[in-house]
């Protein structure tokens, strides 16, 4: 897969996402985004520990690594 496509999908997840309270860990914040992107791309991002997907979920969570990488991509592309 083209590395730029994967990078830009991560950036879009970040730019369209929001911070919210964790359901599992009270007091912890998570960064969530809708998962309306190519499954192949989402699976690769998860394999690289940049996002966390859920079996029947309509959203994904960006990991700390994913947020850091998205911030780098934001500086690079925007």
Ranges and model annotations:
Residues 1-40, 76-77:
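Short amphipathic alpha-helical interface segments
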């Amino acid at each position: 897969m083209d590395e730029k496509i994967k990078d830009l999908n991560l950036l879009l997840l970040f730019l369209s996402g929001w911070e919210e309270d964790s359901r599992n860990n009270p007091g912890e914040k998570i960064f969530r985004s809708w998962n309306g992107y190519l499954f192949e791309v989402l699976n690769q991002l998860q394999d690289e520990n940049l996002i966390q997907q859920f079996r029947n979920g309509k959203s994904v969570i960006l990991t700390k690594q994913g947020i850091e990488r998205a911030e780098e991509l934001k500086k690079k592309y925007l």
